[in-house]
UniProtKB/Swiss-Prot annotation:
PROSITE patterns: RIBOSOMAL_S8. One of its GO terms (molecular function) is rRNA binding. GO terms for cellular component: ribonucleoprotein complex; ribosome. This is Small ribosomal subunit protein uS8. Belongs to the universal ribosomal protein uS8 family. One of the primary rRNA binding proteins, it binds directly to 16S rRNA central domain where it helps coordinate assembly of the platform of the 30S subunit.
Length: 131
């Protein structure tokens, strides 16, 4: 079965796994998914991630993070979709929950948070919001 939006599938798998308190979630790996997982780890939303499996079909394993029995990620929402791409210039990058959350943005310099994109002075495609 073909997945029309692999990033939305990744975010949904994370959301569903945290809803039932799973410690680990697995999914097919890609460069963009690994970059998103790296941003989530750097910002403290997930414990760890690793790529396992053979080179032809790598699998991304994400260790989810909980605090006092509650998921650290309260909300994770897809913004830009394959049918409706959302691009923001360097001056129009949104703040999530007045700076309490992050927006993950795909820029020419790679995938990064909204704060890093503002500091670097680049815009790009808004992939998702995380709070």
């Amino acid at each position: 079965m073909s997945i029309s939006d692999p990033i939305a599938d990744m975010l949904t798998r994370i959301r569903n796994a945290q809803a039932v308190q799973k410690p680990l979630v697995t999914m097919p790996s890609s460069k963009v998914k690994v970059a998103i997982a790296k941003v989530l780890q750097d910002e403290g939303y997930i414990e760890n991630f690793e790529i396992k499996g053979e080179a032809a079909k790598p699998v991304l394993h994400i260790d989810l993070k909980y605090y006092a029995g509650h998921p650290v990620i309260e909300r994770i929402d897809r913004v830009s979709t394959p049918s409706l791409r959302i691009y923001k210039g360097r001056h129009d990058i949104p703040e999530v929950m007045n700076g309490l959350g992050i927006a993950i943005i795909s820029t020419p310099q790679g995938v990064m948070t909204d704060r890093k994109a503002r500091a670097t002075g680049v815009g790009g495609e808004v992939i998702c919001y995380v709070a």
